């Protein structure tokens, strides 16, 4: 009974988002724990070592995030099944909706954590780039955060769909693209290249997610031309 | 809740409640109306839109009745329980979030609340000691004193309640809300004006504080629109939390938070715990527990109700601690009935049962206060780091989710503090010490994970 209750709460879309945000937070906690212990064990703090340690930390973090995404998927799956056994007539929230919401939760949490300190610093006095660093630091951070958030949403949709249809290569692709995006940020002084590549990846993932959630060229056309019966604007025009 | 909406005169309904609710009339479609009647303005709108969809699916008029009512099929009960869980989680997220936002915004902008200007008499030991051991000892001693004051106050309150000294209790509550609404608001307003360097003359100040306080007293202790009452309760919780954040020394605050959750667990779950006794006495007498001091997200009026049945106390009742409302300085009481419970289902026969509906959720003000103290302290002392504050915020919300879930499962008074505060403390310390260096290093190299 308790388990069913847990599951139903998670299965209802409303609590899925903070649930996933919490999972992201826990994944971040584990990855920083690993990074911290490794750093303490290794000991000395010379520059290249610190950089390698950081790269290691980033990779571990990406891995753990994807693991937690999978864990959340499993939890949601159990929840929907539990709900279905309790009440077979009730329409449970669809897995696609849950995928979107959970991706959003992940994305929001990740974006906020990356960006909020930068934001609060930007309110204070100072000149950006006075020591020779690029002056577009804030813009770059903002765009990067945006792309990461959107990417998490698309990754969530694609990931859950891959799990549902047992297409395991999908999970691998998501993991690799996440690693790619994070690795790209390592070449950080080259803002332009970094951002453009990240946006390209985002557009590709977005298109993939669109087709995976059941969209098609035809439905896109209907939507854009306001001829889609299910879409809001259609009802407006009919009046 | 619907019971007394139906029995009472319509005009009172129109005056006191939000316009959305007063528009509902108790028609024979009991379940639909009741459901609408019992929720607050925002969710009532949702129910309205869902009503048409749900019309065809509901054969069972008692579908949303509180589970446990005799005569209902067990599957239905489970389902109702689960429905309760998810919905009420959302209804509580908003006020808790608002309270925390107010506290964090104030802490981050108004310097007054982070300056050390002395301590409460309940925490006499200072933390300005040279050694770590001494500081720890002092904070533990402070905690012991504070907790014993709280326990004493709670027991005093329970004794008063048991011996039906209602006038005394009401007088006490009124005095403390007077103090909160007038004195603390005046101080708060003064500090905010100072921070933003806005000049305000005394007549305007007097008028503002007078209006604010008077309307607050009326809303909280008598009648007023639900939304306004909720807003005032959130504000006084925030003010109280700010006082705690200012006057509790650092380490003492963390130890007190931990100790309060343990106390809460004990007081609510042990058979002889004071909070449990309070709740049970209130249930035996079929009275709501000081409705003025619990945050409820649905109507809790008892006006005109000749005979209250326990069903009117709300499905998920989270009794608070009235003492919390009581002033912080002299009669600080126990932090919260952070209890969450569902009253035993009405043994009342007949039609009243049919009209039971999903009620709102109630959460004690003490819970609001301690959640906000945790998040506020994280904001004040977390090295100016927003990540810590956010992590604590998410942890508390998830703890609240889990607590509500347990409430839906166990259907009795449950403490709302332990799980949330535990998560909050774990996340505060781990984020501050582990995650912050990691994220800072990442940010300085502009890496994104």
Swiss-Prot record, chain B:
PTM annotation (Phosphoserine): residues: 22, 25, 30, 52
Organism: Bos taurus
Protein name: Presenilin-2
Cytoplasmic side: 1-88, 161-167, 223-224, 272-362, 411-414, 436-449
GO molecular function: aspartic endopeptidase activity, intramembrane cleaving
Intramembrane segments: 415-435
Post-translational modification: Phosphorylated on serine residues.
Enzyme class of the recorded protein, top EC level: hydrolase
InterPro entries named in the record: Pept_A22A_PS2, Peptidase_A22A, Preselin/SPP, Presenilin_C
Region (Disordered): 1-71
Biased segments, Acidic residues type: 52-61
Coiled coil: none
Compartments (UniProt record): Endoplasmic reticulum membrane; Golgi apparatus membrane
PANTHER family on file: PRESENILIN (PTHR10202), PRESENILIN-2 (PTHR10202:SF24)
GO terms for biological process, alphabetical: amyloid-beta formation; calcium ion homeostasis; intracellular signal transduction; membrane protein ectodomain proteolysis; mitochondrion-endoplasmic reticulum membrane tethering; Notch signaling pathway; protein processing; regulation of calcium import into the mitochondrion
Domain comment, as recorded: The PAL motif is required for normal active site conformation.
Subunit structure: Homodimer. Component of the gamma-secretase complex, a complex composed of a presenilin homodimer (PSEN1 or PSEN2), nicastrin (NCSTN), APH1 (APH1A or APH1B) and PEN2. Such minimal complex is sufficient for secretase activity, although other components may exist. Interacts with DOCK3. Interacts with HERPUD1, FLNA and FLNB.
Placement of sequence motif PAL: 415-417
Family of the protein in this entry: Belongs to the peptidase A22A family.
Active site: 264, 367
Composition-biased stretches (Polar residues): 19-30
Stretches assigned to the Lumenal side: 110-139, 189-201, 246-250, 384-389
EC number(s) from the headed UniProt entry: 3.4.23.-
């Amino acid at each position: 009974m308790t388990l069913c209750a847990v599951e139903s709460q998670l299965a209802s879309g409303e609590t899925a988002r903070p649930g996933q945000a919490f999972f992201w937070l826990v994944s971040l906690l584990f990855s920083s724990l690993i990074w911290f212990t490794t750093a303490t064990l290794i000991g000395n703090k010379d520059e290249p070592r610190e950089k390698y340690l950081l790269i290691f930390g980033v990779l571990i973090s990406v891995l753990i995030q994807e693991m937690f995404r999978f864990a959340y998927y499993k939890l949601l799956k159990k929840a929907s099944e539990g709900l279905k056994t309790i009440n077979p007539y009730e329409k449970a929230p669809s897995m696609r909706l849950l995928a979107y919401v959970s991706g959003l939760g992940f994305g929001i949490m990740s974006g906020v954590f990356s960006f909020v300190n930068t934001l609060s610093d930007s309110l204070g006095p100072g000149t950006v780039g006075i020591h020779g660093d690029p002056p577009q630091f804030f813009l770059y951070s903002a765009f990067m955060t945006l792309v990461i958030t959107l990417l998490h949403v698309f990754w969530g949709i694609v990931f859950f769909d891959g799990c549902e249809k047992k297409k395991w290569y999908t999970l691998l692709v998501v993991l690799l693209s996440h690693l790619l995006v994070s690795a790209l940020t390592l070449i950080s002084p080259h803002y332009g290249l970094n951002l453009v590549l990240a946006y390209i990846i985002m557009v590709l993932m977005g298109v993939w997610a669109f087709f995976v959630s059941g969209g098609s060229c035809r439905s896109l056309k209907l939507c854009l031309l306001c001829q889609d019966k299910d879409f809001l604007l259609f009802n407006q025009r009919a009046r | 809740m619907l019971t007394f909406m139906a029995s009472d005169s319509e005009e009172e309904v129109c005056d006191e409640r939000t316009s959305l609710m007063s528009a509902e009339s108790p028609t024979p479609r009991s379940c639909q109306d009741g459901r609408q009647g019992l929720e607050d303005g925002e969710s009532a709108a949702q129910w309205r839109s869902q009503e048409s969809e749900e019309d065809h699916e509901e054969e069972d008029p008692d579908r949303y009745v509180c589970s446990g009512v005799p005569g209902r099929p067990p599957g239905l009960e489970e389902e109702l329980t689960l429905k309760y869980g998810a919905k009420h989680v959302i209804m509580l997220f908003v006020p808790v979030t608002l309270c925390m936002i107010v506290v964090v915004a104030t802490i981050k902008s108004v310097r007054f609340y982070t300056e050390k200007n002395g301590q409460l008499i309940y925490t006499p030991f200072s933390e300005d000691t040279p050694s770590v051991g001494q500081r720890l000892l002092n904070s533990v001693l402070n905690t012991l004193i504070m907790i014993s004051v709280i326990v004493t106050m709670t027991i005093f309150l329970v004794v008063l309640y048991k011996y039906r000294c209602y006038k005394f209790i009401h007088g006490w509550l009124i005095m403390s809300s007077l103090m909160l609404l007038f004195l603390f608001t005046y101080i708060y307003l003064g500090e905010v004006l100072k921070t933003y360097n806005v000049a305000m003359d005394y007549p305007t100040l007097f008028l503002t504080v007078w209006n604010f306080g008077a309307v607050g007293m009326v809303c909280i202790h008598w009648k007023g629109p639900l939304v306004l009452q909720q807003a005032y309760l959130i504000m006084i919780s925030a003010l109280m939390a700010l006082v705690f954040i200012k006057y509790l020394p650092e380490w003492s605050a963390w130890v007190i938070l931990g100790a309060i959750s343990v106390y809460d667990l004990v007081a609510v779950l042990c058979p002889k715990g004071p909070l449990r006794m309070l709740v049970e006495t209130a249930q035996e007498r079929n009275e709501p527990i000081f409705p003025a001091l619990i945050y409820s997200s649905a109507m809790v009026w008892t006006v005109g109700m000749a005979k209250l049945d326990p069903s009117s106390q709300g499905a998920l009742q989270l009794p608070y601690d009235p003492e919390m409302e009581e002033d912080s300085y002299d009669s600080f009481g126990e932090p919260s009935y952070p209890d969450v419970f569902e009253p035993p289902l009405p043994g009342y026969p007949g039609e009243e049962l049919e009209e039971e509906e999903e009620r709102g959720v109630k959460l004690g003000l003490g819970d609001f206060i301690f959640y906000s103290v945790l998040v506020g302290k994280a904001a004040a002392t977390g090295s100016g780091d927003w990540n810590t504050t956010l992590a604590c915020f998410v942890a508390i919300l998830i703890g609240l989710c889990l607590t509500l879930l347990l409430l839906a499962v166990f259907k009795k008074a449950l403490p709302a503090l332990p799980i949330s505060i535990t998560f909050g403390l774990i996340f505060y310390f781990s984020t501050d010490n582990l995650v912050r260096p990691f994220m800072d290093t990442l940010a300085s190299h502009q890496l994104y994970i």
